[in-house]
From Swiss-Prot:
Disulfide bonds: none annotated. CDD domains: MGS_CPS_II. Mn(2+) 2 binds at residues 298, 300. Residues 930-1071 form the MGS-like domain. GO terms for molecular function: ATP binding; carbamoyl-phosphate synthase (ammonia) activity; carbamoyl-phosphate synthase (glutamine-hydrolyzing) activity; metal ion binding. The large subunit is composed of 2 ATP-grasp domains that are involved in binding the 2 ATP molecules needed for carbamoyl phosphate synthesis. The N-terminal ATP-grasp domain (referred to as the carboxyphosphate synthetic component) catalyzes the ATP-dependent phosphorylation of hydrogencarbonate to carboxyphosphate and the subsequent nucleophilic attack by ammonia to form a carbamate intermediate. It comes from the Bacteria. This is Carbamoyl phosphate synthase pyrimidine-specific large chain. The lineage of its organism: Bacteria, Bacillati, Bacillota, Bacilli, Bacillales. Small subunit of the glutamine-dependent carbamoyl phosphate synthetase (CPSase). CPSase catalyzes the formation of carbamoyl phosphate from the ammonia moiety of glutamine, carbonate, and phosphate donated by ATP, constituting the first step of the biosynthetic pathway leading to pyrimidine nucleotides. Binds 4 Mg(2+) or Mn(2+) ions per subunit. It catalyses: hydrogencarbonate + L-glutamine + 2 ATP + H2O = carbamoyl phosphate + L-glutamate + 2 ADP + phosphate + 2 H(+). It comes from Bacillus subtilis (strain 168). GO terms for cellular component: cytoplasm.
């Protein structure tokens, strides 16, 4: 059926900020969809609150609204734009939930807006647990025995009939939020209450647990003509019971017989037809390992994390084709862009194995509960491609950048057998490594199958890897053994360690023996047809399929998996850099391993290599391609950390030189440079031993800021208030030695200011200055940032401009530069300089219209800023106020303290823009998920050091009509200042205490600041966690509270500004 001509204007809903369960895969899907619709000639209107994405770039749609994703804001945009249709299936759960709500409120009908792609009734049938179960029963398709419940009593009644264990699945939530497996009454109470709270329709499905079954997924496409195909089928190595986003997944499935494969394939196609889904859809099934009994777990009627993985695993662009299906095109009318010869109706075929391993944030959150279940905890994922499962899996392991390069964990050998068994039985994020350790201790495949319920096929493969380790150790220097090790996916780093030689020596040995990988093409058709895509992976075979052209090429290193501290902002910069390289007339080559992102879409670069970002894997590509240089500025710390090794092997690093990168990152050299340039910095020194650290800290004076050198996202950074805490930090957070020194700085309290700049060595362009709302000490990625600055004098701005220019020139920066300053007692100090792209680059680029990553790339390639018409210094400020606010995923991570500090904790960001600071703040806070009711109660629990400031805040809350709740001591202190406060019991006291108030929804805001030092924080920790579990905004910085107050004050009439009219009777005029 040809595309529709009765519609012209289409509104696309984005997925908003990156949170656990909804990451960069929707930026990729949304970007593909917008471009596909524009390609077909439609006018595209995009709404998304996330400034860090490619999707919100002006080139992606005809009009882009970076506004909060709430029904209220969308209603205004729909009334203003009057689109003919809306496409909600590319914005994740957020997009679906909004479409359903806009329909229920009657907005779509009022404005005559049609829903494209999958119909709302189908979305509701797939998402509403009750409707879905009813449909499955009508189709005679098996679902686990289950019950829809709306209260704890209903849950207890159901369990008394079928017994434990049961799985709880809340309706309309994302990434399994609020769900879990319950094995007893206590767990049932906790999980059901939480699940009902988090479900927007207060409904949960309780089902008999089928944990231990194989979990199989089918990614299916269907068009309006009822053509339906399977794009990819995938198998979770972890059995049912662990969220698929937290499972290690392989494609194609490895353990299904043809009969099983066809059985589940037919079921998946039957379901997509029964639901009437038009576009992409993900079907999750459970299969009994010992029979043909299967159950349907769920259907996602939208583009999902799995479809991004399936797209990258097969090369088949699901989101692009789903968008075209939505406007009426059918699969047999569209060409498959990979081959350019076959139609999209051909099912892809794979002649390789793909492995996906999730990337969890537990390196950031040491205290988090690492146990995996039905609620997702990973922030991102990596994918690797190999000819065998072993090769693909080992490549994925070293892509994780989790300090592992083989199936080995540093301290796994030290734990007892008992603990090892426990960690295999109760799945955690490191189970794969513990399985390998168990084999080294003599456990058998049967033992481990019994402990983990993982299929014996996968366990045999792992056993084979561990067995080969012995052969490798026994045959040092044997090139036949070396070749087999490389075919299995063993890394040079591991082999060189076992053979007691340098990695570079092993590399030379391999070269002499002719043991080098070849590159194979991902072509969707197992080499049956010729293919046009330049999408490659390495493997140790004979024939190389990657043809090197005569054109000069430039290689860009991507940023790997999404994790806290290194998010989608770096992918944004990578993509812009690739576009700039192509514009400059060079061939752009990208190396990356993240299946969720735009940068790994094969249509972005001239050549895409899907490989681990390690020195070995990158060098293989360089050996073949011989690029004129490598760009490391845009891939975050991942790429910067490779610069040294690459340079040592004779590779040219483009942009800022290695010596100058080192001057910015190495503490002593940096201090020296600042001294020469006359730029002040806080008093600080470098310690290489614990004793030295203690004496430095006492010389400088507490509190001090301590951090390891060369890190991103403030990893292991802390503010320390006395010696005892310093010793605890030294012992637990860092491994201090002369190679890994620790930096100790005087902790300055003051306003933090951030600047991004582009320099070509002669001219320095500063697009803008951003002022942070939270004072120094809160990581810049977790602060609310405002542009243009609202409280800085012209003198201070001038000084920041001078220092930035001096630093850029003094450090010989070529390309991008990010500087953080602190304004303390009228003086500007430099906190740190990052000679690379930063997480504020997309935000500033969008506001100022200065395409920073694109410009920086052209500078790196030898052009000058003056040629583009830029003059030196701070550029004129834009009209309006722009606010960037962080977004956290604390609800998904139990036992994590939400207090803001120098270590980054946010997973994403949103932007609010308007004519005044208050309005822009309001939009940013609403977009980040904070409710701002203009009446209610605020619960105040502040540390003694914050009492005075807390008092001022309480006064202002009281003035706008808020009730103040506080514990006895604080309430007394407030009463002395004539502020009425209701007394609430401390934790553990009888009567309504702090936790009861939060649980019962009696407080709209909780303001809680840490007591000095970390230890007495346990009560504070419980208050903060209780707030998160109950969805109450908890503010751990008084600056954030002040910002919310500004918004509330601008929205409400203050009581003291509404005096009653004087009714003095005597003066009344008598008639």
């Amino acid at each position: 059926m040809p595309k529709r001509v009765d519609i012209n204007k289409i509104l696309v809903i984005g997925s908003g900020p990156i949170i656990i369960g909804q990451a960069a895969e929707f930026d990729y899907a949304g970007t593909q969809a917008c471009l596909a619709l524009k390609e077909e000639g439609y006018e595209v209107i995009l709404v998304n609150s996330n400034p860090a994405t490619i999707m919100t770039d002006t080139e992606m749609a005809d009009r882009v609204y970076i506004e909060p994703l709430t029904p209220e804001f969308l209603t205004r945009i729909i009334r203003k734009e009057r689109p003919d249709a809306i496409l909600p299936t590319l914005g994740g759960q957020t997009g679906l939930n909004l479409a359903v709500e806009l329909s229920e409120r009657g907005v779509l009908a009022e404005c005559g807006v049609e829903v494209l792609g999958t119909k709302l009734s189908a979305i509701q049938q797939a998402e509403d647990r009750d409707l879905f179960r009813t449909l499955m029963n009508e189709l005679n398709e098996p679902v686990p025995e289950s019950e829809i419940i709306h209260s704890l009593e209903e849950a207890e009644k159901f369990v008394s009939q079928i017994g434990f264990p049961v799985i709880v699945r809340p309706a309309y939530t994302l990434g399994g939020t609020g769900g879990g497996i319950c094995s007893n009454e206590t767990e049932l109470k906790e999980i059901v209450e939480n699940g009902l709270k988090l479900s927007p329709v207060h409904q949960c499905l309780l089902e008999k647990s089928i944990a231990g079954y194989k979990e199989i997924e089918y990614e299916v496409m269907r068009d309006s003509q009822d053509h339906a195909i399977v794009v990819c089928n995938m198998e979770n190595i972890d059995p049912v019971g662990i969220h698929t986003g937290d499972s290690i997944v392989v494609a194609p499935s490895q353990t299904l017989s043809d009969r099983e494969y066809q059985l589940l394939r037919n079921v998946s196609l039957k379901l997509i037809r029964a639901l009437g889904i038009e576009g992409g859809c993900n079907v999750q099934l459970a299969l009994d390992p010992d029979s043909f009994q299967y159950y349907i777990i769920e259907v996602n009627p939208r583009v999902s994390r799995s479809s991004a993985l399936a797209s990258k695993a097969t090369g088949y662009p699901i989101a692009k084709l789903a968008a075209k299906i939505a406007v009426g095109l059918s699969l047999d009318e569209m060409m498959n862009p990979v081959t350019g010869k076959t139609y999209a109706a051909f099912e892809p075929a794979l002649d390789y194995v793909v492995s996906k391993i999730p990337r969890w944030p537990f390196d950031k959150f040491e205290s988090a509960n690492r146990k995996l279940g039905t609620q997702m905890k990973a922030t991102g994922e990596v994918m690797a491609i190999g000819r065998t499962l072993e090769e693909s899996l080992l490549k994925a392991v070293r892509s994780l950048e989790a300090d592992v390069y083989h199936l080995e964990l540093k301290d796994a050998a030290d734990i007892s057998d008992e603990l090892l068994e426990k960690r295999i039985k109760k799945a955690g994020d490191e189970r794969l490594f513990y399985l390998a350790e168990a084999y080294r201790r003599g456990y058998t495949v049967e033992d481990l199958h019994e402990f983990s319920a993982i299929d014996v096929f996968f366990l045999h493969k792992l056993f084979g890897i561990v067995q080969f380790e012995k052969e490798l150790k026994a045959n040092a220097g044997d090139t036949d053994v070396l070749r087999r090790a490389k075919e299995l996916g063993f890394s040079d780093q591991y082999i060189s360690r076992e053979w007691k030689m340098k990695e570079s020596e092993l590399y030379s040995l391999r070269k002499q023996a002719g043991i080098a990988p070849v590159f194979k093409m991902v072509d969707t058709c197992a080499a049956e047809f010729e293919s046009e895509t330049p999408y490659f992976y390495s493997t140790y075979e004979e024939e190389n399929e990657s043809v090197v052209t005569d054109k000069k090429s430039v290689m860009v290193l991507g940023s790997g998996p999404i994790r806290i501290g290194q998010g989608v902002e770096f992918d944004y910069a990578t993509v812009h850099s690739v576009w700039a390289i192509k514009q400059a007339g060079y061939e752009a080559i990208i190396v990356n391993n993240n299946p969720e992102t735009v940068s790994t879409d094969f249509s972005i670069s001239d050549k895409l290599y899907f490989e681990p970002l390690t020195i070995e894997d990158v060098m293989h590509i360089i050996d073949l391609e011989q690029p004129m240089g490598v760009v490391v500025q845009f891939g975050g710390q991942t790429a910067i950390n490779l610069a040294d090794e690459l340079s040592a092997r004779g590779v040219k690093i483009l942009g800022t030189s290695l010596e100058d990168l080192d001057r910015a990152e190495d503490r002593d050299k940096f201090e020296q440079a600042l001294g020469e340039l006359g730029v002040p910095q806080p008093l600080g020194k470098t310690a290489t031993s614990v004793n030295q650290a203690v004496s430095i800290a006492s010389d400088i004076g507490y509190p001090v800021l301590v951090r390891p050198s060369y890190v991103l996202g403030g990893r292991a950074m802390e503010i320390v208030y006395h010696e005892e805490e310093l010793l605890h930090y030294m012992k637990n957070a860092v491994k201090i030695n002369p190679q890994h020194p620790v930096l100790i700085d005087r902790y300055l309290t003051g306003k933090e200011i951030e600047v991004d700049a582009v320099s070509d060595g002669e001219t320095v362009v500063i697009p803008g200055i951003m002022e942070h709302i939270e004072r120094a000490g809160v990581h810049s990625g977790d602060s609310i940032a405002v542009y243009p600055p609202q409280s800085l004098t012209e003198d201070i701005k001038k000084k920041i401009e001078q220092y930035t220019i001096a630093l850029a020139k003094g450090l010989n920066i070529v390309g991008l530069l990010n500087i953080q300053f602190v304004l303390s007692q009228g003086e500007v100090y430099v906190l740190e300089v990052n000679p690379r792209s930063s997480r504020t680059v997309p935000f500033l680029s969008k506001i100022t219209g200065i395409p920073m990553a694109n410009l920086a790339t052209k500078i790196i390639l030898g052009q000058k800023l003056a040629a583009f018409g830029y003059t030196e210094g701070l550029q004129p400020e834009q009209q309006g106020v722009f606010v960037k606010a962080p977004v956290f995923s604390f609800a998904k991570l139990r036992r994590v303290d939400i207090t803001l500090g120098p270590e980054m904790k946010s997973t994403g960001e949103v932007m609010g823009k308007d004519s005044t600071l208050e309005k822009a703040l309001y939009k940013a806070l609403i977009a980040s998920g904070i409710q701002i009711p203009n009446y209610g109660s605020v619960l105040l629990t502040v540390a003694d050091k914050d009492k005075e400031e807390g008092l001022a805040i309480a006064k202002r809350f009281h003035a706008i009509g808020y009730n103040i709740l506080a514990t006895e001591g604080t309430a007394g202190y407030l009463k002395e200042a004539s502020i009425p406060a209701k007394v609430v019991g401390k934790i553990g006291q009888d009567g309504p205490n702090l936790l009861d108030v939060i649980r019962n929804g009696e407080a709209q805001f909780v303001i809680n600041t840490l007591t000095k030092g970390k230890q007495p924080a346990r009560d504070g920790f419980r208050i903060r966690r209780e707030s998160v579990e109950n969805g109450v905004a908890c503010l751990t910085s008084l600056d954030t509270a002040e910002a919310i107050l500004r918004v509330l004050e601008s929205m409400t009439f203050r009581a003291d500004q509404m005096p009653a009219v004087n009714t003095n009777q005597e003066a009344a005029v008598t008639i």
